[in-house]
């Protein structure tokens, strides 16, 4: 539509803007009634009227001041240390402190706070705030029978059940439990068997909270202690993968097949590092591989478990268990299929130097290996039909061990809160709780957890909850009684004395065996020298002397036997003569009696 004509008007002709204000009511028009019109109307009586007996309401709208809200979080680290500083690492702490103390703002702040801090310190020193008013009051110790109760049971949701091969607790409290499911029987899995593993909420056993979907069944699974959303898993085909629960069920990254293990990965452990992305894995192919999650293309380091220290794969022993203590970051230990425990040093320069010590006493695979959290020099191993406690100083034998059980032992671990308590699982589906301060020959508590064999075991860091996984895919969550998860009076000192006593005893036995071994070696060497000097004539003389000595011993035994027979015959003759005399005297007595009668 085209504009035909435009009307133009000046701004000054628009008039003023409206300006409203409050004022009282005014009467402008008042029309009075006209009585002449009254005849036009008729009064109606009665009149129908409708009324509503309710309170009158009206709708009003108001505009209030709007407040904008948003969600914010705060990340508190223990001790106020930065994320990349581990408070347990002495070198990192000292390095960080020196760096901060050189800062000018730090020095200025300390000088400004010195006066107020000094005043506060004087206030604290004026009164002993740590005074114990009831130091002499004896606490009544209530003897509680060791017990445990089942809290929840988590079952494999698939139709074809698989063993629960590994368990891992959520690092930030007893909230979740990650379970790896895999069948380790060779070529026994079908195409319909699921490869999924699950993360369970311990309050909801009906449905898994999260599903992990690997390309191969997971044999082991571990939470990252520094990032609760990240997990590392070892697959049945030898690959290593890690998941981030914020990014879905699929693995974020996997190691390539050509640079991975060639057998199932039985154990993966996170390393104590600044980045929190380093880990290492062990497999029955005889290799231990180190990885960095930021680059899984190939391992950062490799070690072949060859006890001969030659680094040959044909001599390597398959690794089933792996141990790493964060307080000793350079050391780790492995347990092999052949029953050998190998102690290693990662920081050694050459592969032979990395294998430090070898312990051998199990006659079957070492399924579990863990250091005591209170005494790192002592470690627990579980294999064949026994559980054994070792000392690093004694290599020939363990210092303590359990009796041989009727069922095969499958897993074991220490209590994180009591140095004298450890747990073991068996093929008959039972869980044994051992308290070495209470008794050492038998378990303190034995529970029949499942009708199927128990395969895995894990204790929560607070020591109250314990989870076990069975061959049927059932994970049972148990709660221990307070006596089993509360440190007893003087327990640490008593356990220290017990370990030292047993270590000293084994050292004495070891030195005695060494002396006997040297004597036997010396005697055998001397015998060989005599044989070489004497020749065949002396050998014939020795044989003749041995035969002569043998026949002399036989003749002496014959004479001794003949003397014993003669002595026995004499005794028999005496007994017969005495019996005949007694019979004769009895006959005479009877004849005399008849005559008198």
Swiss-Prot record:
The keyword Ribonucleoprotein does not apply. It is found in: Cytoplasm, Cytoskeleton, Cilium axoneme. One of its GO terms (biological process) is outer dynein arm assembly. GO terms for cellular component: microtubule; outer dynein arm. Keywords: Cell projection, Cilium, Cytoplasm, Cytoskeleton, Dynein, Microtubule, Motor protein, Repeat, WD repeat. Residues 512-546, 562-597 are annotated as: Disordered. Residues 528-542 have a biased composition (Acidic residues). Residues 584-597 have a biased composition (Basic and acidic residues). The keyword Repeat applies. GO terms for molecular function: dynein heavy chain binding; dynein light chain binding. WD repeats lie at residues 159-210, 213-253, 260-301, 314-354, 361-400, 404-444, 449-488. Consists of at least two heavy chains (alpha and beta), three intermediate chains and several light chains. May play a role in the regulation of dynein heavy chain activity. Belongs to the dynein intermediate chain family. This is Dynein intermediate chain 3, ciliary. The lineage of its organism: Eukaryota, Metazoa, Echinodermata, Eleutherozoa, Echinozoa.
